[in-house]
A protein has these predicted regions:
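Conserved C-terminal helix/tail region of periplasmic/extracytoplasmic solute-binding proteins
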Residues: 50, 146, 370-434
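Glycine-centered hinge/linker elements that transmit conformational signals in sensory
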Residues: 164-167, 208-239, 279-284
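Extracytoplasmic/periplasmic solute-binding protein
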Residues: 127-131, 136, 162-211, 254
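C-terminal lobe and pocket-closing loops
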Residues: 92, 262-274, 287-397, 434
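Extracytoplasmic "Venus flytrap"/periplasmic binding protein-like
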Residues: 42-115, 119-121, 127, 147-149, ...
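Short, well-ordered beta-strand elements
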Residues: 24-34, 54-59, 82-83, 127, ...
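Short, solvent-exposed loop/beta-turn-alpha elements that line the ligand-binding surface or hinge
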Residues: 101-115, 182-185, 200-220, 269-273, ...
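Hinge/lid segment of periplasmic solute-binding proteins
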Residues: 87-136, 159-162, 176-177, 189-192, ...
Length: 434
C-alpha cells in the first residue's frame, strides 16, 4: 500500500511539474543592438513579475543582420521569433501579405503621434506598436561652432553645413567637421543618402518606375556627399553606421553629425564626453522645399507564425506603453524615455525640462512627409525608402556602390552608372517596367 501511495504521489508530482512546464511560455524576441533596445532588456523584470508564466529570450543583432534574419524567417514561415523589431518600411508590406498579427491591445492607441501611427497601419489595422519614433537632425558641437566663428541656424542649408565642416575640421587633433553614415545597407547609408537626395531634388523613380540615378540631381547629391566626407569626415567612414558615428561623436571627434533624432539622449547622456556642448538643428535643405530628414519608427510586431501570439501581444503592449516610459524615467531619468511615439510625452513638463532636444525632435518628425517625399512627383510613398518589397534588396546593392565611392575604390560616376543598371534590371525583372 505504501509503495502504491508513493507511486501515486510521484506520479502527481511529475504531472504537476509537466503542467508547470506546459504553463510556462518562452517568447523569443528579435531586436536591434541600439541603446534604447538594450536598455529595455534590463528593465523587463517589471513585465516578468506581472507575468511569471512568460520567459523572455533575446536575440540582439546588428541592424543589417537583424533585417536579414527576420525577413528570411517570416518569408519562409520559420517561426523562430515571437516578437520582431521592424520598422515603417516592413510593416505596411508585411501587414498586407498577412505575415503579421493585427494588434488589438496597444496601450492608449489614440495617444500615438499621427505620422508614426499611420506608417504602421494597413487598412485601418495597427500591425506594429512603435517603441521609438525618429526623424533625423543635425547634432553639433556648440563650442567648435563658436570657435569657427559661426552660428548654427535652426534650419540650415547644405552650403552652411559644408562651410562649417571645413572650419571645424582639425585632423591633427582627430576632430572631423562632419560624421555621416557610410556603411552599406538600405537602412544604413541609403537611409541617409535617400533622405538627403530628396533635398537636392532627386528621386529613386519617375512616375513610370524608371530609375533616376542618371539624373543631374543624384550626381549633385553624391558629389556633395563624397566631396565633403573626403575633406572633413573621419578615416574609414565607409564602414561607419549609426553606432560607429555615435561612438565617434561621444568621444569628441565629430563637429557635426546628421543622423537619427533618437541619438539626442545619448550624445547628451553620461556616456558622452561632450554632453554639455551639444546643440540641435533641423536637417539641411537646398531651398527646394524638402529637407534631408527621414521618418522611422523601430516597432514591435508579432509574426503570424508565432505559436504564442497572445503572450507576445501582452509583451508588445507592455514595452510600448506609457507605463514603460515611467519605468525608464524612474530608473534612468526622463531624458532617456523612448522618444517620438506619443503626443502625451511632448506635453509632459518633466520630459520637456529634462530633454532640451524634445522640441527639435518633434519638429523634425512633423517636417517629414512620406506621402509627398520628393520635389518632383513619384509613384511611391516613403521618405528614406520606397515602400515596395523589392526596395531592400535593390537599395542594399546600390548602397554597396555608394560606399565604394566613399572609400575611393570607384568614382561617383561609376557608382551612379552601376546603381542605374542594378535598379533598371531589378525593376524590369519585378515587372514594374515593361
Amino acid at each position: 500500500m505504501k509503495s502504491l501511495v508513493s507511486s501515486l504521489l510521484g506520479a502527481c508530482a511529475l504531472s504537476a511539474l509537466s503542467l508547470a512546464a506546459q504553463a510556462e511560455t518562452n517568447l523569443t524576441i528579435a531586436t536591434v543592438n541600439n541603446g534604447d533596445m538594450v536598455r529595455m532588456q534590463k528593465l523587463t523584470e517589471d513585465f516578468t513579475k506581472a507575468n511569471p508564466d512568460i520567459k523572455l529570450t533575446w536575440v540582439t543583432l546588428e541592424e543589417n543582420v537583424l533585417r536579414q534574419k527576420v525577413t528570411t524567417d517570416i518569408a519562409t514561415k520559420g517561426g523562430q521569433f515571437d516578437v520582431l523589431t521592424i520598422g515603417t518600411y516592413e510593416v505596411p508590406i508585411w501587414g498586407k501579405k498577412g505575415w503579421l498579427v493585427p494588434l488589438t491591445n496597444v496601450d492608449d492607441v489614440d495617444d500615438l503621434l499621427p505620422a508614426i501611427r499611420s506608417g504602421l497601419t494597413v487598412d485601418g489595422k495597427l500591425y506594429a506598436a512603435p517603441f521609438y519614433g525618429e526623424s533625423s537632425m543635425v547634432m553639433y558641437r556648440k563650442d567648435l561652432m563658436d570657435k569657427a566663428g559661426l552660428k548654427m541656424p535652426d534650419a540650415p542649408t547644405w552650403d552652411f553645413i559644408k562651410q562649417a565642416a571645413d572650419k571645424m575640421t582639425d585632423k591633427a587633433n582627430e576632430v572631423y567637421g562632419i560624421c555621416l553614415r557610410g556603411k552599406a545597407g538600405w537602412g544604413e547609408n541609403m537611409a541617409f543618402l535617400t533622405a538627403t537626395s530628396n533635398s537636392f531634388g532627386a528621386r529613386w523613380f519617375d512616375e513610370k518606375w524608371g530609375a533616376q540615378f542618371n539624373s543631374p540631381e543624384w550626381k549633385k547629391t553624391l558629389d556633395f556627399y563624397v566631396g565633403m566626407m573626403k575633406a572633413d569626415g573621419p578615416p574609414g567612414a565607409s564602414s561607419n553606421g549609426f553606432n560607429e558615428n555615435l561612438a565617434l561623436f561621444n568621444a569628441g571627434k565629430c563637429g557635426m553629425w546628421i543622423d537619427a533624432t533618437v541619438a539626442a539622449s545619448f550624445v547628451t547622456g553620461k556616456e558622452s564626453k561632450v554632453a554639455d556642448k551639444v546643440g540641435f538643428a533641423l536637417a539641411p535643405d537646398n531651398g527646394l522645399g524638402k529637407r534631408g530628414n527621414w521618418l522611422w519608427a523601430w516597432s514591435l510586431a508579432v509574426p503570424a507564425g508565432s505559436a504564442h501570439a497572445a503572450e507576445a501581444q501582452k509583451f508588445v503592449s507592455w514595452a510600448t506603453s506609457k507605463h514603460y516610459g515611467e519605468i525608464v524615467a524612474a530608473k534612468e531619468g526622463w531624458a532617456n524615455v523612448p522618444p517620438g511615439t506619443r503626443t502625451s510625452l511632448y506635453k509632459n513638463p518633466e520630459y520637456l525640462k529634462a530633454a532640451a532636444f524634445a522640441p527639435m525632435t518633434l519638429a523634425s518628425i512633423n517636417a517629414a512627409d512620406p506621402v509627398h517625399p520628393t520635389v518632383k512627383p513619384v509613384p511611391y510613398v516613403g521618405v528614406q525608402f520606397v515602400a515596395i518589397p523589392e526596395f531592400a534588396g535593390i537599395a542594399t546593392d546600390v548602397g554597396q556602390q555608394f560606399s565604394a565611392a566613399l572609400a575611393g575604390s570607384m568614382t561617383v560616376d561609376e557608382a551612379l552608372a552601376k546603381a542605374q543598371a542594378i535598379t533598371d534590371t531589378a525593376m524590369k525583372k519585378a515587372g514594374y517596367v515593361k
